[in-house]
């Protein structure tokens, strides 16, 4: 994974998709849990989690920023076996990471291995649809390191193959956030399959079988 040569570049690169306003939909699954943030970057999400949570990332620069925030982090290339034993975490948080790794299915298997029984996996992904590309062309053009693009159905199949069951799906609508239309976004979540193409990102919450 390569997000840029400096932590500042990483932060600038991920600003459009990092602390998504739609994070409020998945936060209840994270509250007061022992969490591993896979691809924790400069810790924007990690610092919102409980004190016994930790993160892993492949960038020394990013981890330096995390440590200045007193966050527990570890340097690791997540393309390999994760450096933890089985049944270690209650929740694994993986935001805008799977599209970058060499083998998404292997990472999902590793997440399953280190989750406790019925533990929760939260995956955040960009939506790379035609409509969104027209509106956010600058975003996608600045992300040549994306190796994969996932539809909701495609992601669901990967999760099923790696021993997860999907329990929730939420979309992120950037234009609605711009105009502070949170109630409209709440309503539109009921039609996520129909509206996937006009969202800019989405979350999937899955439980270990």
What are these regions (language model features)?
Residues 2, 8, 12-21, 44, ...:
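S-adenosyl-L-methionine-dependent methyltransferase catalytic module, highlighting the catalytic core
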Residues 96-100:
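A short His-aromatic
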Residues 113:
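Basic phosphate/pyrophosphate-binding loop/patch that engages nucleotide-derived ligands
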Residues 1-85, 91-95, 108, 169-172, ...:
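Conserved N-terminal segment of class I S-adenosyl-L-methionine
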């Amino acid at each position: 994974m390569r997000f840029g040569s400096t932590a500042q570049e990483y932060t600038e690169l991920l600003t459009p998709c990092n602390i998504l306003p739609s994070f409020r939909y998945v936060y209840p699954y994270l509250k007061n849990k022992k969490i591993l943030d896979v691809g924790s970057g400069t810790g924007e999400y990690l610092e919102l989690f409980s004190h016994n949570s930790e993160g892993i990332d492949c960038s020394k620069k990013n981890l330096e920023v995390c440590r200045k925030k007193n966050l527990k982090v570890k340097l690791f290339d997540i393309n390999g076996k994760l450096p933890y034993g089985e049944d270690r975490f209650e929740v694994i948080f993986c935001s805008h990471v799977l599209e970058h790794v060499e083998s998404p299915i292997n990472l999902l298997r590793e997440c399953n291995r280190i989750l406790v029984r019925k533990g929760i996996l939260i995956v955040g992904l960009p939506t790379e649809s035609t409509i969104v590309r027209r509106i956010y062309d600058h975003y996608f053009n600045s992300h040549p390191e994306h190796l994969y693009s996932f539809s909701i159905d495609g992601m669901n199949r990967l999760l099923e193959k790696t021993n997860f069951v999907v329990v929730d799906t939420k979309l992120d609508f950037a234009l609605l956030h711009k105009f502070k239309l949170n109630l409209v976004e709440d309503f539109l979540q009921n039609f996520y399959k129909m509206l996937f193409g006009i969202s800019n990102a989405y979350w999937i919450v899955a439980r270990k079988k």
